[in-house]
Amino acid sequence: MKIIIGILLVFFVTFSVGTAFGHGAGIEASPLIFTNDREVKVTVELLPADFYKSDQKMIKIDAYDHTNRETITNASFKVQIFNDNQLLLDEWFYTQDGNLILEVDPDVIVTNRNTIEISGEKNSFGLWEKTDTTPLIVTGPIFDEGGIYTFKIILDAQDEV
C-alpha cells in the first residue's frame, strides 16, 4: 500500500562568502527535524570547494529522511537567499529525484544589471524544474561579492512510503 506523506519544513542556513570571511564554500545542514514520525534533514551545499573563485558555481539542496535512510523525492523547495539581510532570491523549485541543482552565474546580465533571474522551465504548477535539456541557471548579482549569505528553505514533499 502506498501512503503519501506531506512534509513542510523551514530552516535557515548561513554561509560566509569572500576572502574576509574564509574560503566561502561549504555544506550546511539543518538539525534533524521530527515530523510525521520521521527525522528529516535539509542540506545546502555550495560547489565546488573553491565556490567563490570558480566560474562554474552550483548550489545543491536536498532533503534526507534519516528514518528511512533515503533522499526525499518529489520535493518542492521554496528557496530564499539573503545577503546581509537583503532578499536576493525568493522562488519555488521542484525536483523529482530530491536533488535540486542550481547553476549560478553572477556575471551574466539577462535584462537588468540589478535583477537576479532564473533560466529554465516551469512545470504545470508554476515551479521551476530542471529538465533533461534545460538546467536551472540563476544569473545576475548573486554571489558576486563577499558577505554573509543566509538560505531560508521551506520543504514541501509528497513522497511515497
Question: Predicted regions span which residues?
Answer:
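N-terminal soluble domains immediately following signal/targeting peptides that reside
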Residues: 21-161
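Secretory targeting signatures
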Residues: 1-24, 61
